[in-house]
Amino acid sequence: MLAPRVIIFTTASLLGSPTRTEYEASEALAEIERRKIPLVLLTRGTRAQLEILRRKIGHAHPFVTEGGGGLFLPDGYFALRLEGAKRAARYLCVPFGRTSEEAGAAVQDIAEQAGAEVVRYADMNAREISSNAGTSEREAEASREREFSERFFFAGNADLAAPSFEKIATERNWRIRHCEPFWELYSGNDEGKAVRYVTRLYREALRSRLRSVGIGASFEDLSLLTASDQAFILPLRAGDFDERLLAKLPNSVRIDVPGAVGWNQTVLDVLSRT
C-alpha cells in the first residue's frame, strides 16, 4: 500500500449520526479505510462526547477536542518524540489550551470581580445540565468531562452580566463564547494550530509533503479551514451557507449538499482526484 497523499481534517458534527441503518457517510468512510487515508476529527465538544462517534465509525486516527484545546494521538500512532505530550488513558495528548481546572477557577474569580452570579458545569450534575440543554443525561455527562475549558451560565440577567465578565476575562487572557444556553471560558484553544501541528507530524513521519484538506460549514470552522491546503465548505442547511465564512475564504470549494450526504460526496470527490 502506497503512503497516503492527503490528510482530511473535518468538523466531526458533519458526519451526522451513524445510528441509522442507512448511514449517509458510510461509503466515504469505507473508502477512507480502504485507502488508509488519515481522517482527523475536530470538535468543540469533549473527548468523551467525541468517543461516542469514534466508536461507532471505528475511528483510529488523531482527533482534536474542545475547539483546539488538545490533540489526542492513539498510542503508538507516530514513532516520533512529541515534546510536551502527556499520557491520557490510551492516548498521548498535546495540550494547546489551559486546563479545565484553571478555567473553572477563573470563571469563579472573574464572576466575583464582575459582580456576576454564575453556576459552573462543575457545580451541576448530569440531570441539571440535561434539563437546561435539552440533551440526554448520557450526553450531558459526557459534556461535563471537560479538559480544556469550563462552561457556566449566568444566574441573573446575562445581557447585563456578560459584557463586564467578558471584558475582565479578556484582560486576563481568557476568551469567552456563547454556547446556548451556556457560556464557555477557555484560553489557548486553537484548531488552526492543532491542524498545522498534526500535519507536520504526518509529513515528518511519512517523509512526504501530504496535501491537507479541510471540511467545515460554520464560521467557527474558519481556523481549521484556513490551516488546510484546500478548504471545502458545506451549507448549514440546503442553500444556506455561512456568508461570513465564504467572505473569509473566497477560494474555497462550495458543496451544494449539507450534512453527512454532502460530506460523503466531498470526501469521495477528493479521493477520486488523489
Predicted segments, located by residue:
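Short, surface-exposed amphipathic charged segments that create phosphate/polyanion-binding patches used
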Residues: Y77-L82, A133-S136, L268-R273
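Residue-level detector of anion-binding/catalytic polar loops
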Residues: P38, R175, Q230-A231
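Residue-level signal for inorganic ion chemistry
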Residues: T43, G67, I129, V195, ...
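Non-catalytic pre-domain segments flanking phosphatase-related domains
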Residues: M1-F9, K56
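Mg2+-dependent phosphoryl-transfer enzymes with acidic/Ser/Thr/Gly-rich catalytic loops
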Residues: L2-A3, E22, F182-T274
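Structured N-terminal alpha/beta-domain signature
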Residues: V6-R20, L29-E31, V40, R44, ...
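Conserved acidic, metal-coordinating active-site core of Asp-based
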Residues: I110-V213, F219-D221
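Active-site phosphate-binding/coordination module
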Residues: T21-Y121, L236
